[in-house]
Regions:
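Active-site metal-binding motif and surrounding structural segment of the metallo-beta-lactamase
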Residues: 34-81
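Accessory terminal helices/loops
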Residues: 169-179, 188-273
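Active-site-adjacent loop/tail segments of enzyme domains
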Residues: 152-178
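Conserved beta-strand hairpin/beta-sheet module of binuclear metal-dependent hydrolase folds
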Residues: 1-46, 124-129, 136-144
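Core dinuclear metal-dependent hydrolase active-site scaffold
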Residues: 19, 99-136, 173
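Divalent metal-coordination and catalytic microenvironments
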Residues: 20, 30, 55, 67, ...
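Active-site neighborhood of phospho(di)ester-bond hydrolases with catalytic His/Asp-centered motifs
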Residues: 29, 49-57, 78-83, 113-116, ...
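Active-site environment of divalent metal-dependent phosphoester hydrolases
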Residues: 14, 35-36, 56-62, 86-89, ...
Length: 273
């Protein structure tokens, strides 16, 4: 059985469409544009076999129709996505607790409910490849859309702070070595805000230097890992006394608990420059 390859395909200004392939067949996660996906598929000689969607925003679903229309009539492309959102292109609606099992490539995902950015947002957690009895992946993977970014989280367009914090807690509970495939290259701007929240975080300062070096070479800062984000991401560190002290000093608000800290951080981030 071939190893799986995880390829970030740049789209728009800062999106990543993720392709997962065994060297022959591939699935696309959140294809907001069709052209970049088609280009990579053609360059590598891969066949697209399924699409996974995390939420309804146009920069995540806009390329689906074009990709489906380019498929042979005898090989319709299944499109998986959240049942709780009105996404017309979805043919296989999903909810948290469901499992997606694919044959080509042979891979399985557990579906996680992660509302906040949108009300019905889901994530896909890959634990083990189908048919590999007794064998797991070298590491797990999660495709989290716009819920979690490196050193950040998605804006709350539809959900509440409590929902988003619970969603981040659910992701934080995944194994620490889980590779986190975020949908945007926001890392450098997020690090600036994270350092404002927690200037004494040495791991965060080191990540700033590493991320700057990666971007200077045109290399993605993703995937990250759950353990790394728990060490550097202020939105996953809402119980940090250092962050609480910063929020009280900068915003002149009393931080009563981690939800209050998260809410203040998210509001601050919305206007941070």
């Amino acid at each position: 059985m071939n190893e799986l390859e995880y390829v970030p395909v740049p789209a728009f200004e800062d999106n990543y469409i993720w392709l997962v392939s065994d060297g022959r067949d591939a699935i696309a996660v959140d294809p907001g544009e069709a052209a970049p996906v088609r280009r990579v598929l053609a360059e590598r000689g891969w066949r697209l076999t399924a699409i996974l969607l995390t939420h309804h925003h146009a920069d995540h679903v806009g390329g689906v129709d074009a990709l489906r229309n380019s498929q042979p009539d005898d090989a319709p492309l299944p499109v998986y996505g959240p049942a709780a959102e009105a996404i017309g292109v979805v043919t296989r609606p999903l909810a948290g607790g469901d499992r997606v099992t694919l044959d080509a490539p042979a891979v399985a995902f557990d579906v996680l409910d992660v509302p906040g950015h949108t009300r019905g947002h889901i994530a896909y957690f890959q634990t083990a490849r189908q048919g590999a009895a007794g064998q797991g992946n070298a590491e797990p993977h999660v495709f989290c859309g716009d819920t979690l970014f490196s050193c950040g989280c998605g804006r709350l367009f539809e959900g509440t702070p409590a929902q988003m914090l619970a969603s981040l807690d659910a992701l934080a509970a995944l194994p620490g070595d889980t590779r986190v495939h975020c949908a945007h290259e926001y890392t450098l701007s997020n690090i600036r805000f994270a350092l404002a929240c927690e200037p004494g975080n040495a791991a965060l300062a080191a990540w700033r230097d590493d991320a700057q070096a990666l971007r200077a070479r045109g290399v993605p800062t993703l995937p990250t890992t759950i353990a790394h984000e728990c060490a550097v991401n202020p939105f996953m560190r809402a119980d940090s006394a250092a962050i609480h002290a910063t929020l009280e000093a900068e915003l002149h608000e009393t931080v009563t608990d981690r939800l209050a800290a998260f809410t203040l951080m998210r509001e601050w981030k919305n206007r941070f420059r």
